[in-house]
């Protein structure tokens, strides 16, 4: 595989990278994981300081980034906006330029992706999108790594996604066609992806000869699936008053053992977590033979480690 010099690049959306660059990062993730479990310790982030600025609560993203930085020899600082002068009205451009002098990279988890772009505009050091309302690129990288671990390839696999069409879905939509996978969204009517991301995916699917579709029947969607991917029905940032409507709309989309039996014999079940048992899937599925969700969660650490190791100068 070719080597790529990604130093100084921001990681805000996978759409900023080629298939070859993304595959390079995934291979690096797998190499770092293999070395760690073989007892080999590498420290590409030794002497580096990474800031984690999180507006949204987090279990996996915060802990995986902190563990990744530590395992690669670096040091991380976790901050909330209400602890900074941002709370009193300091503009992002001032905060960004100050943090740029103190840290070697900034990892941001927030609401609007335009805020992440604004930080990147004012910083020379790399900025990483740790989740916005629009996209969750680090999750998509962990998903791709997990699929590669389980199948050994991506091309020709059928991935079925069911759940809220929000950041995680958008990043899957943007990456699945690029890696040669067919993608089916199984969602109720009225739950549509962002037009910009769907158009990007349509172009990639047409270029690579893959299938991209939205269906409103989960059982029909999962027939012949290699990967069944469920997600919460109600994402962070969505209005509280929509919760009950969403539960009603998505009620026919619970992944059960019966649903999984319609997929291929070797099919795997994925979920980015947190999972709400009895809603998007039953306990029998997430704890059953199909589930790879905790391998998937671990791989967040390794893909984030690779991203940081590759882009930090």
Region annotations inferred by a language model:
Residues 72, 102, 122-124, 179, ...:
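Short, structured coil segments at secondary-structure junctions
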Residues 40, 97, 104-175, 271:
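Anion-binding alpha/beta catalytic cores of soluble intermediary-metabolism enzymes, centered on
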Residues 266-267, 272-313:
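Adenosine-phosphate binding glycine-rich loop
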Residues 1-63, 67, 135:
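Positively charged, low-complexity intrinsically disordered leader regions
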Residues 49-102:
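Active-site cofactor/substrate anionic-group-binding motifs, chiefly glycine-
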Residues 203-283:
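Rossmann-like adenosine-cofactor binding region
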Residues 55-67, 149-231:
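Glycine-rich phosphate/diphosphate-binding loop of Rossmann-like nucleotide-binding domains
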């Amino acid at each position: 595989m070719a080597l790529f010099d990604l130093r100084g690049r921001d990681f805000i959306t996978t759409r900023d990278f080629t298939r070859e660059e993304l595959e390079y990062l995934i291979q690096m993730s797998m190499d770092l994981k293999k070395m760690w479990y073989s007892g080999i310790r590498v420290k590409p982030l030794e002497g580096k300081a990474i800031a984690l600025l999180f507006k949204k609560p987090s279990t996996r993203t915060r802990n995986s980034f902190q563990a990744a930085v530590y395992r690669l020899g670096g040091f991380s600082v976790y901050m909330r906006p209400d602890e900074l002068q941002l709370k009193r009205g300091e503009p992002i451009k001032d905060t960004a330029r100050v943090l740029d002098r103190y840290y070697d990279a900034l990892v941001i988890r927030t609401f609007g992706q335009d805020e992440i772009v604004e930080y990147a505009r004012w910083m020379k050091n790399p900025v990483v999108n740790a989740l916005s309302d629009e996209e969750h690129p680090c999750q998509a990288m962990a998903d791709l790594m997990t699929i590669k671990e389980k199948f050994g390839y991506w091309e020709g696999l059928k991935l079925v996604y069911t759940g809220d069409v929000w950041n995680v879905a958008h990043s899957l939509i943007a990456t699945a066609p690029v890696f040669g996978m067919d993608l089916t969204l199984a969602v109720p009517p009225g739950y549509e992806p962002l037009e910009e991301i769907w158009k990007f995916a349509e172009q990639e699917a047409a270029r690579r000869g893959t299938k991209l579709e939205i269906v409103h029947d989960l059982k029909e969607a999962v027939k012949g699936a290699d990967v069944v991917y469920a997600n919460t029905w109600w994402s962070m940032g969505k209005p509280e008053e929509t919760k009950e409507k969403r539960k009603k709309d998505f009620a026919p989309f619970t992944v059960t053992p019966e649903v999984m039996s319609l997929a291929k014999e070797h099919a795997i079940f994925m979920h980015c977590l947190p999972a709400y048992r009895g809603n998007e899937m039953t306990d029998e599925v997430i704890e059953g033979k199909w589930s790879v969700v905790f391998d998937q969660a671990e791989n967040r650490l390794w893909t984030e480690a690779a991203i940081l190791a590759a882009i930090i100068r």
